[in-house]
């Protein structure tokens, strides 16, 4: 087995500088009101790296680099949330999601209705198995950042679904038209809990 020698120019293509990143735009799904998107997502999400995929997804489209393909594919991003904020409960069915707390404190909630939780402090890490309904929420008193790592087969990165009651929450808070726009835009509701 031999080593690989790469020069500084090639190594620079493998560096992502935070100061050069812009947050990934909030998903725009057929004129879904921005407050619905805010309910479903972190305040800001910075995509550092995503796998090269045949079907371009929002993960790859806005990533600073494509890579991490040493076997299973990997996506690396940072979710930034103000106190009390985080995405809606959801499940990844074919990919594994891991969280590393960078700043503030984050509750990792899981279970069919998010009935279980634990708190990550800075430098704490958790790995959530596929199929588990989960979310994260900043429970600190200041804006926080969470490193989010998703790993799986490159064509399985659009595997997110939301429990049916999240659809009910959207309908109650934002109306049936908002939910219709979410589902027609590709969001899946009605996860099966076994």
Where are these regions (language model features)?
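Double-stranded beta-helix
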Residues: 2-12, 135-194
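A short, N-terminal "cap"/entry segment at the start of jelly-roll beta-barrel domains
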Residues: 1-73, 176-194
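Conserved GNAT-family N-acetyltransferase fold
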Residues: 79, 99, 126
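A generic fold-level signal
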Residues: 69-73, 93, 141
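Conserved short histidine dyad/triad with adjacent acidic residue
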Residues: 55-64, 77-92
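A short beta-strand-loop-beta hairpin characteristic of the jelly-roll/cupin
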Residues: 86-89, 93-122, 132
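Conserved metal-binding segment of the jelly-roll/cupin
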Residues: 82-84, 120-141, 149-151
